[in-house]
């Protein structure tokens, strides 16, 4: 059996303004078989997604400039089938409900690890 090529790997857009967290989670997700693209904020994430909408997205709620909620809405407009997990260090029921209404499939409170993210993406 041949190892999966990048074309066979599911695409994942990881958006978080915390560079250290972003790098660690990106490496962990790559080891779990995802083709990961990262972005530090909403404008950079949209630039990537408009070129190729991701199959999966992991989006931080609080980032400089626009909120992750704005990004969720725009990602769903690009491709309604994108599975999105919202991450936040500021968990609240109201925000979780808003994220789900906008199209997120799951909501996780930080700190999280890659196994939790994979489980949420696959629910």
Functional labels for PLM-detected ranges:
Residues 33-40, 48:
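Short hydrophobic/Thr-rich beta-strand motif most characteristic of the beta2 strand and flanking loop
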Residues 22, 64, 88, 92:
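The feature encodes the CheY-like receiver
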Residues 41, 67-70:
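Acidic catalytic/metal-coordinating carboxylates
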Residues 52-58, 63:
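Active-site beta3 strand of CheY-like receiver
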Residues 47, 69-81, 98:
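Short amphipathic alpha-helix used as the core "switch/output" element in two-component signaling
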Residues 16, 60, 88:
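Active-site residues of response regulator receiver
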Residues 23-31:
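Charged docking surfaces used in two-component/phosphorelay signaling
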């Amino acid at each position: 059996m041949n190892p999966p090529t990048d074309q066979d790997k599911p695409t994942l857009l990881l958006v978080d303004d915390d560079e250290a967290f972003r790098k660690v989670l990106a490496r962990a997700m790559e080891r779990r078989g995802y083709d990961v693209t990262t972005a530090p904020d909403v404008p950079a994430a949209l630039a990537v997604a408009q070129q190729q909408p991701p199959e999966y997205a992991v989006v931080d709620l609080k980032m400089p400039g626009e909120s992750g909620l704005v990004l969720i809405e725009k990602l769903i407009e690009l491709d309604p089938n994108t599975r999105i997990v919202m991450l936040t260090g500021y968990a609240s029921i109201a925000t979780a409900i808003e994220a789900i209404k906008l199209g997120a499939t799951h909501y996780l409170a930080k700190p999280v690890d890659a196994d939790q993210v994979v489980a949420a993406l696959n629910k």
